[in-house]
Structure formats: structure tokens, C-alpha cells
């Protein structure tokens, strides 16, 4: 996953695996609080980035130029789980899992609430940990983050994570949708 830091030193920078596990953990937390299908969000979360290329976004950029219809990791993720795994037989995943994987990052929204949870959880994870990785790499400090943003989302990685997850839970309770408040989503 390390998109910004190509040669990280130490063991605190995120990888594709740690990102996927963070997405899964955040998604399960939200699903549990909303009494939705935790196993479904976990299956979607664990498969959502399986189609990413080596070398991060640079690899995806190169493949995008080589492929006739472009390259999108979410579409490749679905190809992997439907066709490439198990010697070409696929993993026999439900439509809901495949829909969540495909639409976690596209112009279309997932058709299930669980898929929408993973879509938000993915954004929460990559935004929060890109900031955290930049702070650990001394590229920026917490004080470099605009004060208004820190007041809204929190003054640390943990506070931002809690704010974002709590906001989704509170704004999605007893609704037929998964959403953030406009103030938090805009931040």
C-alpha cells in the first residue's frame, strides 16, 4: 500500500495487507454498531484491493496505458475472485461480496449497506494512514494540518479515526443508507 513512501524504513508504514486489515476492522466496527452483517463486510473488505498491481499507483498507471480499456484495480479484483483463483474456477463468492468489491471505488455505489460501509472504511483507512505515515516520515507534523480540520476531525490519528467511525454510525442509525454528516464528509 505504501503509495507515498516507496522505500520505507522501520515497521510502522502501512502496506497493502495492513491497509486491508484496517479497512476490515473499521468496517466490522461500523457493521456491528448498526447491527448489519459483519461477515459480509469482512469478506468485501478482505477482497477489495486484491486486484492492485505491484508498485502501487505507478504500476496501475503503466497497466492503464497498456490495457485496451484501461486498468482499474476494482475490476481486476472481481476478475481474480471470479476467474483466476482456484485454477480458473473462482471463489464462488456471493453477488453481494462481488458487488461490494467492484463498487468500493467506482462511479457506482455498492447495492448493499455492507458494501457502502466498506467504501467509507476504505476512505477512512487510506486518508488517516497516509497522514499518519507522512507524520512518521517527518514529511509533515500534526500542526501542518489546518486547525479547522483538526478541530473538526481530531488532533491525532486515533481521534480522527474515532470521529469518522462514530459519525458514520450516528448518521446511519435507523436509516436505509450509510452516510456521514455533511460537515465531516466535507472535511
Q: What kind of region is each of these model predictions?
A:
Residues 46-50, 105:
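Acidic, glycine-rich active-site loops and adjacent beta-strand->loop/helix elements
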Residues 42-47, 120:
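Short alpha-helix carrying the canonical HExxH Zn2+-binding catalytic motif
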Residues 1-16, 20, 24-30, 35-38, ...:
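Histidine-centered, transition-metal-coordinating active-site segments
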Residues 39, 43, 56-71, 136-138:
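Post-HEXXH active-site segment of zinc metalloproteases
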Residues 28-30, 49-52:
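A short acidic, glycine/proline-enriched capping/turn motif at secondary-structure boundaries
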Residues 51-55, 125:
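Short active-site segment of divalent metal-dependent hydrolases/proteases
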